[in-house]
Structures are given as C-alpha cells and as structure tokens.
From Swiss-Prot:
Subcellular location: Cytoplasm
Catalytic residues in the record: H156, K160
Protein residues bound to (S)-2,3,4,5-tetrahydrodipicolinate: H157, G166, T167
Catalysed conversion reaction: (S)-2,3,4,5-tetrahydrodipicolinate + NAD(+) + H2O = (2S,4S)-4-hydroxy-2,3,4,5-tetrahydrodipicolinate + NADH + H(+); (S)-2,3,4,5-tetrahydrodipicolinate + NADP(+) + H2O = (2S,4S)-4-hydroxy-2,3,4,5-tetrahydrodipicolinate + NADPH + H(+)
UniProt entry keywords in alphabetical sequence: Amino-acid biosynthesis, Cytoplasm, Diaminopimelate biosynthesis, Lysine biosynthesis, NAD, NADP, Oxidoreductase
InterPro entries, per the entry: DapB_C, DapB_N, DapB_N_CS, DHDPR_bac, NAD(P)-bd_dom_sf
Organism encoding this protein: Nitrosomonas eutropha (strain DSM 101675 / C91 / Nm57)
The protein's Enzyme Commission number: 1.17.1.8
Protein name in UniProt: 4-hydroxy-tetrahydrodipicolinate reductase
Gene3D superfamilies for this protein: Dihydrodipicolinate Reductase, domain 2, NAD(P)-binding Rossmann-like Domain
Protein task: Catalyzes the conversion of 4-hydroxy-tetrahydrodipicolinate (HTPA) to tetrahydrodipicolinate.
Amino acid sequence: MTLLNIAVAGSTGRMGRTIMETIADAQDLRLSAALEQPDSPYLSQDAGGLTGTPCGVIINSDYASALTGSDVLIDFTRPAGTLTHLAVCRQSGIHMVIGTTGFSAEEKEIIHDAAKDIAIVFAPNMSVGVNILFRLLEVAAKALPAGYDVEIIEAHHRHKVDAPSGTALRMGEVIAQTQGKNLEKVAIYGREGHTGERAADTIGFSTIRGGDIVGDHTALFAGIGERLEITHKASSRKTFATGALHAARFLATKKSGLFDMQDVLGLR
C-alpha cells in the first residue's frame, strides 16, 4: 500500500492534535511533518508525544525543509499564517487542505490564484453533516415562498477569534445565492438599540462564544404561523479531522484546482 504523506500546520493546537491522532489511526496515511510557529515551546519535540504515541516526527518551524516528502499540508491556523504556508506549498508543488476561516475577499483571491498550480480543498467546515446541511439549506431556500425571515445563529468555544464563523457565513451565502441575492447587501450582523422593524429579505447573524462549544449552527426560517429550523451540532473535533483527511485523499488524484467539501463528498 502506498501511504499518503500528510503534514499538519498548527500541529500543537486543538485541531492539529486531533488531526495527528486521526492520522495515527489510519492505515493509508503517514504523518510526514508537524509544523509550528518559530516561538513555539514544542519545537524539537516528538509530535507523537502530544497524542501519547511517539512517532519520530519532530515538530519544526522551517516549512520549506520540513515539507520535503509531504504530499498534502492540512492547515487549520489563521489567515496570515495560512497564506505564508500557501506560498511555500505552491512553490514546492504540495497540495493543501485549508480549514482556516476569517479570510478577507482579497486573501481568498490569493488562494484562488494558487489553485492554478496546486490542488486545494478550501472549506469553512470539513464535517459531512455540515455539508449535507448546506444542501438542505438550498432546498429550503428554494422551496419556501417569499415572506420567511432568515436568521443564522452560531455558537463556538471562547477561544474562537473570528465572528461570525466561516460556516455561518457559508450558510448565508448558500441561502442568498439560492434566492438570487448578494449576501454582502442583505446581511445584518447583530442588533443593538432601537433598530426599528426587521427589514424584509435580510439575513441576520447572531454569534455566541463560551466554554468549550465545538460548534453549533442553526438556520431559522421564520414565517407567519410556523418556523423551520435546520441545525447541526458538533460534539467532537474528530468529525472535522476525519473530513480533512477525506479531503487529503481526494487531492491525491488531482493536479491543480480549487475544490470544497461538496466536491470531496460527491454532493456537487
């Protein structure tokens, strides 16, 4: 069996550790590099020690050298770091799975451009359930008649730094596009004070941050006399790690191009 060599950026973070644990359980994958920032206290340690099973892969901050021999880099870090890693991968011909959120429109264009040379799966949420949720939102947004107010509510742990979440924004994009709208023109991010009546055809976003919530997302379609709620709740980061590794396997057969989890799961 030919093993797929996986490098993990942000390897000592919550997602990084979960991804490495999941790689260790897979028969067809091998952890080829564990990467961190230059000031990380974990540098030069065995990455497997973080998950209880030493593996001989040393945590490194030199991406250019550490990525030698890797097929795919999985990156759940922050936008600035991801773009730096992207430049190295593009130059080295290494594919990427990007789960980082919080990119600006201009930063997303950089990712789109890099996909001319390498294959990239770029998705705000890697879980199977959330990507089925996106399809259900298309069905609801298309089937429900005019007059239903749309609100998106998301909740995450206290450490999440961007709001609304990338998944919530993608939910809004799916609904807006299905209804022939531009999300930038109809989105309402939070409400405070005397706001007046709710404007028709807008999409509201509400954000909750607290504790160790892995990720809850709800789309509320509120009509007169009834409301429809479509909800996904993640109870473990393992679901995101498993999805990211599915994405890495998907990229093994690609030369270049930009994909998302709808492509990986055959939903498009």
